[in-house]
């Protein structure tokens, strides 16, 4: 059997996706995109040759490295996704992937009110709504459609929801592990490669190949030691009104570092230290990462939750009024000590460095040895590495280096477009959306026709979509038309955009009252070729809104109605854009917001504050501010022109380099991978980034290591050592089964092997000619070849002792596991295949021998 593997390169010089081709199915794994290296147009040009061949996409991590191109691909190749391509990922990867995509695209100007706009915020949301959410160890069974294909996701231990994928067919088993961590950190358990006893997981043993990369590794120091160094660095940086800047991936390491900062502040308040230090978050996605984290606690380490439950039942992601969601130009509003988490994208990092990088009171903590999406941080790393004296202690000890140099940084200047340019851009955008929606609607109808077996059905929803096509397109700044068209037959009632669409139609009903259509109940037309499930009258159940965790409940109906003092919008569920607060909060809430989040002497005040922050998500300022509102990224009345220029900036800040990555270290990787006993290890391209030392160790252990080239298909062949044979039902009725233990039965099988062709699936699906082996009964004239009897089973001396005791014999163990019966007969196990019964011929000897043979099955 063969399979083909290809490392995709869109021009960045690195692997931005992996394509695995089996006989009748092609998988794309982790399609990434780095806007700082490859432009939007170049990326589309590359993927337009790849996507038409793809059937399934799987995502392993919520970082840009693994899903940066997903929304881009869905938007530009929607017809392929609607008609064929299924995307699978765990729920945290879906949620946090939205955050990383918004940050990356907004930094590059792909979304937002700019003249470089290519997508809307709604397009990103819709692309992630298409992904099928999974749990760990949940089987994705595609065997009937793709000839034995199954997918299983296991915990990778790097990011929340990060996965190691096991891809299996009838003849192959591939393990894909791009990033993984064998030890637990502050919020996540270790990867599921090893079980509780330290042995490799049986379901991952002996794969055809392990697909991984050896370019990044974590520190060999224990996590607790690195965490202590990190907290000590924070304390030192906050002293003397200092500021700490932490660039971090908001969908990756941010939650781990945030909980460590929370622990530091919690412990410091007990000794009245750092009681008023704000925690600032600078991200285009604002506070969505924390909001998602609060709804995904079951994906985190139970020990973390237990620890914080014991701390007066607080949450690791609730700091109260300390947390502020700000923009870079608002940093000047927070003088003195502060902790700043900055999203690891070039535009934000550069603005922050320009604002605070020239202050000696600023400490910049770099938590990993390279930053692909922020070139300015790589330049700072190069400055530190140039000093050989400092390099000797780099990077584990967390030593502070004074950086007094000039570096060149790209800055983005935004200039408002004129009214004429804005209107022309909106008209162009309107035409583009109208054409795209018409194409999508046609693809949707064709896909539905194929799925229904060409049955003609009175599709009320489809006709309504056609009638209101122009209405939807004209409301470009309102409800996105794609929300209605893409609703389809699956989970229409679960999307809240449908309610917005109904409101939109109601608003237009007065204008088009004369054209209003009345729905008349009619029978459906059933064609002979229609599937059996469509030969029935339609049934429209009541609409019940659901999300990933069950039925959506409006909690406002359980709260007291006090419209004068209560902000109604603050009780809405999080992550609903446009839910702006209109009425001011009462004076008591404002007072609670201004107080410190860790008032140890007043638990009642803390509980009320915790409740307020949980429902409102306010930043603690005088005016109510939505924690997750991203309306500023929508194209409204004004548009800006982005101009990129380079400036020289003087740095006078302190730099601390500390490897806090949740990745496996080099020594552990060289030990764990060989324990899986894989036939080969396939390393993603390019070859020069792979660790040569570990590669040599793997080769020394007789493991075939394959370094993949970029954009070149490599074919791998696998010798089949096992065969799947089905037993014919007629032969099954003739078998005499014998039980040899509580879990196993055996039988003697004699028959003739016949090759049969498998039935074909639907004609519009891709299939491969495959046959199966069936064992059928011999003809009546045939005689089986007789050989000596073979005994199969396991002789358990403990069970034998129990049987003899029930027969009133005296059986006891004596020396080296020998079972002695009545001091006359002894039973010893030499090994698993040899058992000796020692004694003189007697009735007792025969009884013991019979009990032993009864434990075995003879064939």
From Swiss-Prot:
Gene Ontology biological process: mRNA processing; termination of RNA polymerase II transcription, poly(A)-coupled
Keyword annotations from UniProtKB, A to Z: mRNA processing, Nucleus
Skewed-composition ranges (Acidic residues): 586-597
Top-level lineage group: Eukaryota
Main location: nucleus
UniProt subcellular location: Nucleus
Matches recorded under CDD domains: CPSF2-like_MBL-fold
GO-annotated molecular function: RNA binding
Region (Disordered): 560-611
Pfam family, one: Lactamase_B_6
Keyword Hydrolase included in the entry's annotation: no
GO (cellular component) term, any one: mRNA cleavage and polyadenylation specificity factor complex
Task performed by this protein: RNA-binding component of the cleavage and polyadenylation factor (CPF) complex, which plays a key role in polyadenylation-dependent pre-mRNA 3'-end formation and cooperates with cleavage factors including the CFIA complex and NAB4/CFIB. May be involved in poly(A)-site recognition. May be involved in the association of the CPF, CPFIA and RNA polymerase II complexes.
Additional record remark: Present with 3060 molecules/cell in log phase SD medium.
Subunit description: Component of the cleavage and polyadenylation factor (CPF) complex, which is composed of at least PTI1, SYC1, SSU72, GLC7, MPE1, REF2, PFS2, PTA1, YSH1/BRR5, SWD2, CFT2/YDH1, YTH1, CFT1/YHH1, FIP1 and PAP1. Interacts with the CTD domain of RPB1/RNA polymerase II; the interaction is enhanced upon phosphorylation of the RPB1 CTD domain. Interacts with PCF11.
Protein name: Cleavage factor two protein 2
Gene: CFT2
């Amino acid at each position: 059997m063969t399979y083909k593997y290809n490392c995709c390169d869109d021009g960045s010089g690195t692997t931005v996706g992996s394509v695995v081709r089996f006989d009748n199915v092609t998988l794309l794994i982790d399609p990434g995109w780095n806007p700082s290296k490859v432009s939007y147009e170049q990326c589309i040009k590359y993927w337009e040759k790849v996507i038409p061949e793809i059937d399934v996409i799987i995502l392993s991590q919520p970082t840009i490295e693994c899903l940066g191109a997903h929304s881009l691909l869905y938007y530009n190749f929607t017809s392929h996704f609607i008609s064929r391509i299924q995307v699978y990922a765990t729920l945290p990867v879906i949620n946090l992937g939205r955050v990383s995509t918004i940050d990356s695209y907004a930094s590059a100007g792909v979304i937002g009110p700019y003249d470089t706009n290519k997508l809307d915020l709604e397009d990103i949301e819709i692309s992630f709504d298409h992904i099928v959410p999974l749990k760990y160890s949940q089987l994705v069974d595609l065997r009937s459609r793709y000839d034995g294909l199954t997918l299983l996701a296991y915990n990778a231990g790097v990011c929340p929801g990060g996965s190691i994928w096991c891809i299996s067919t009838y003849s192959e088993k591939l393990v894909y592990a791009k990033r993984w961590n064998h030890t637990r950190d502050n919020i996540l358990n270790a990867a599921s490669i090893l079980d509780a006893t330290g042995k490799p997981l049986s379901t991952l043993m002996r794969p055809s190949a392990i697909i991984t990369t050896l370019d990044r590794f974590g520190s060999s120091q224990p996590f607790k030691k690195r965490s202590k160094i990190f907290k000590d660095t924070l304390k030192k940086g906050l002293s003397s009104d200092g500021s700490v800047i932490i660039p971090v991936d908001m969908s990756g390491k941010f939650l781990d570092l945030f909980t460590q900062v929370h622990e530091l502040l919690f412990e410091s308040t007990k000794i009245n230290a750092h009681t008023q230090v704000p925690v600032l978050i600078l991200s285009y996605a604002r506070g969505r990462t924390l909001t998602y984290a609060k709804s995904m606690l079951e994906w985190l380490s139970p020990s973390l939750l237990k620890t914080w439950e014991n701390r007066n039942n607080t949450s690791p992601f609730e700091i109260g009024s300390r947390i502020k969601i700000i923009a870079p130009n608002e940093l000047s509003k927070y003088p003195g000590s502060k902790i700043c988490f900055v999203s690891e994208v070039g535009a934000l990092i550069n603005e922050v460095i320009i604002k605070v990088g020239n202050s000696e009171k600023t400490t910049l903590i770099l938590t990993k040895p390279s930053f692909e999406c922020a070139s300015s941080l790589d330049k700072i790393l190069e400055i530190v590495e140039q000093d050989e004296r400092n390099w000797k202690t780099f990077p584990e000890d967390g030593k502070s280096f004074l950086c007094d140099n000039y570096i060149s940084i790209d800055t983005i200047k935004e200039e408002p477009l004129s009214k004429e340019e804005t209107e022309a851009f909106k008209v162009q955008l309107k035409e583009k959306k109208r054409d795209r929606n018409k194409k999508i609607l046609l693809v949707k109808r064709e896909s539905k026709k194929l799925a229904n077996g060409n049955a003609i059905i009175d599709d009320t929803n489809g006709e309504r979509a056609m009638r209101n096509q122009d209405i939807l397109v004209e409301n470009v700044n309102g409800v996105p038309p794609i929300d209605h068209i893409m609703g389809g037959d699956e989970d229409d009632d679960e999307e809240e955009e449908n309610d917005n669409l109904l409101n939109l139609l109601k608003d237009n009903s007065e204008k088009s009252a004369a054209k209003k259509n009345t729905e008349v109940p009619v029978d459906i037309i059933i064609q002979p070729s229609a599937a059996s499930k469509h030969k029935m009258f339609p049934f429209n159940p009541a609409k019940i809104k659901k999300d990933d965790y069950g039925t959506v409940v409006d909690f406002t109906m359980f709260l007291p109605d006090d419209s004068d003092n209560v902000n109604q919008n603050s009780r809405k569920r999080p992550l609903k854009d446009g839910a702006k607060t209109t009425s001011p909060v009462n004076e008591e809430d404002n007072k609670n917001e201004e107080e410190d989040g860790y008032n140890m002497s007043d638990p009642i005040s803390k509980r009320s504050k915790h409740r307020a922050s949980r429902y409102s998500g306010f930043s603690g300022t005088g005016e109510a501010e939505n924690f997750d509102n991203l309306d500023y990224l929508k194209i409204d009345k004004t548009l800006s022109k982005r101009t990129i220029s380079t400036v020289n900036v003087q740095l006078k800040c302190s730099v601390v380099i500390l490897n806090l990555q949740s990745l496996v270290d080099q020594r552990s990787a060289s030990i764990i991978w060989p324990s899986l006993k894989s036939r080969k290890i396939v390393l993603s391209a390019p070859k020069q980034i792979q660790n040569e030392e570990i590669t040599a160790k793997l080769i020394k252990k007789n493991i075939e290591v394959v370094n993949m080239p970029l954009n070149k298909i490599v074919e791998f062949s696998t010798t089949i050592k096992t065969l799947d044979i089905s037993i014919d039902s007629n032969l099954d009725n003739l078998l005499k089964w014998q039980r040899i233990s509580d879990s196993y039965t055996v039988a003697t099988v004699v028959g003739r092997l016949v090759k049969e062709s498998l039935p074909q699936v639907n004609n519009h699906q891709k299939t491969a000619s495959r046959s199966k082996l069936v064992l059928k009964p011999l003809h009546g004239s045939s005689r089986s070849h007789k050989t000596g009897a073979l005994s199969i089973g396991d002789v358990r001396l403990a069970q034998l002792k129990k049987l003899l005791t029930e027969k009133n014999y005296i059986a006891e163990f004596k020396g080296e596991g020998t079972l002695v019966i009545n001091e006359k007969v002894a039973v010893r196990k030499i090994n698993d295949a040899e058992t000796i019964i020692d004694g003189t011929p007697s009735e007792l000897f025969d009884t013991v021998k019979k009990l032993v043979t009864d434990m075995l099955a003879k064939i």
